[in-house]
Curated annotation (Swiss-Prot):
The keyword Acyltransferase applies. The active site is at C164. GO terms for biological process: flavonoid biosynthetic process; polyketide biosynthetic process. Its EC number is 2.3.1.74. PANTHER family: CHALCONE SYNTHASE 7 (PTHR11877:SF62), HYDROXYMETHYLGLUTARYL-COA SYNTHASE (PTHR11877). This is Chalcone synthase 4. The lineage of its organism: Eukaryota, Viridiplantae, Streptophyta, Embryophyta, Tracheophyta. The primary product of this enzyme is 4,2',4',6'-tetrahydroxychalcone (also termed naringenin-chalcone or chalcone) which can under specific conditions spontaneously isomerize into naringenin. It holds the Pfam family Chal_sti_synt_N.
């Protein structure tokens, strides 16, 4: 008779979870950051708020963002005036948009990832979907299963309302699934659409304006699995270790509330300070077992909550400016796409490493870190190992 431990052993993969493909997608509508304040104050009928507009222009200018992609076009906003007001009841209109757009954009990214992976989609065993937008039942995971034509017995996981740290969470979950289920191939999809958070400006709620200056729409998809099939599957990064922690004394630093007026965000001024204060401890926990204490010797993928967070982390750890190159590039070209951001940065890094003729997918280095920061204040840490190009 076979023992439970033998069954358990047979169920587990041999090697570490590996990212085998990455795909990304954005809505067609691209907005230039330099002219966005004009558009934003016009469409929200707020042009009379001249001081507030000047403040918003300064926020946009300092954001280090060149452009963002948004599902919400001028036409859509004109058809939905309640979405343009500051706190008008508008949840129905917002939900009707995002329950369609989140799976649609997610499908676009997933199709690209599946194509790069090169295996039939029938080999996908698990699906993880993450979004901060829209909550219907059955959820976006079900809609994606249908849109992609996945098998009905794919094991699905739906993560709603996590926020900006969740790009790390989906990797942590995918790693556990891939390593504990021999032959598992996990499709991960983060799809974020800001239609749920867009609203007009308010003199009394400036942290809402910060979100209006930073957030963009995007979806990213990965295929994750252990023990890649030689000659068919091409590993991009290995996931070696993961952790999640709530930063001490950080309650209320980042809050989101889904109400009749949509999703509102509240940020404390010291979010960059809280992140930079706690990052050293997270790095020691992650890299001490590997004998690494020089954080300029690893590659960096950090959720770009905003330029101030990146600046303070760089300063605190005395990082060379080029360490955050991929992170700042994604922030500049897409804005803050919540959970999808770090997956876009993974894609940017492996592509640039190949273009530049470097030895590994991680800018020529072996070890790297991926950080997610978000409501809680929650910090996700993933230790990555690059792959030779």
């Amino acid at each position: 008779m076979v023992s439970v431990s033998e069954i358990r052993k047979a169920q587990r993969a041999e090697g570490p979870a590996t990212i085998l493909a990455i795909g990304t997608a954005n809505p067609a509508n691209c907005v230039e950051q330099s002219t966005y304040p004009d558009f934003y104050f016009k469409i929200t009928n707020s042009e009379h708020k001249t001081e507030l507009k000047e403040k918003f222009q300064r926020m946009c200018d300092k954001s280090m963002i060149k452009r963002r992609y948004m599902y919400l076009t001028e036409e859509i906003l004109k058809e939905n005036p309640s979405v343009c007001e500051y706190m008008a009841p508008s949840l129905d209109a917002r939900q009707d948009m995002v329950v369609v757009e989140v799976p649609r954009l997610g499908k676009e990214a997933a199709v690209k990832a599946i194509k790069e992976w090169g295996q039939p989609k029938s080999k996908i065993t698990h699906l993880i979907v993450c979004t901060t937008s829209g909550v219907d039942m059955p959820g976006a995971d079900y809609q994606l299963t249908k849109l992609l034509g996945l098998r009905p017995y794919v094991k699905r996981y739906m993560m709603y309302q996590q926020g900006c740290f969740a790009g790390g969470t989906v990797l942590r979950l995918a790693k556990d699934l891939a390593e504990n289920n021999k032959g598992a191939r996990v499709l991960v999809v983060c799809s974020e659409v800001t239609a749920v958070t867009f609203r007009g400006p308010s003199d009394t709620h400036l942290d809402s304006l910060v979100g209006q200056a930073l957030f963009g729409d995007g979806a990213a998809a990965l295929i994750v699995g252990s023990d890649p099939v030689p000659e068919i599957e091409k590993p991009i990064f290995e996931m070696v270790w993961t952790a999640q922690t709530i930063a001490p004394d950080s309650e209320g630093a980042i809050d989101g509330h889904l109400r009749e007026a949509g999703l509102t965000f509240h940020l404390l001024k010291d979010v960059p300070g809280i992140v930079s204060k706690n990052i050293d401890k997270a790095l020691v926990e992650a890299f001490q077992p590997l004998g690494i204490s020089d954080y300029n010797s690893i590659f960096w993928i950090a959720h770009p909550g905003g330029p101030a967070i990146l600046d303070q982390v760089e300063q605190k750890l005395a990082l060379k400016p080029e360490k955050m190159r991929a992170t700042r590039e994604v922030l500049s070209e897409y804005g803050n796409m919540s959970s999808a951001c770090v997956l876009f940065i993974l894609d940017e890094m492996r592509k640039k490493s190949t273009q530049d003729g470097l030895k590994t997918t991680g800018e020529g280095l072996e070890w790297g870190v991926l950080f997610g920061f978000g409501p809680g204040l929650t910090i996700e840490t993933v230790v990555l190992r690059s792959v030779a190009i």
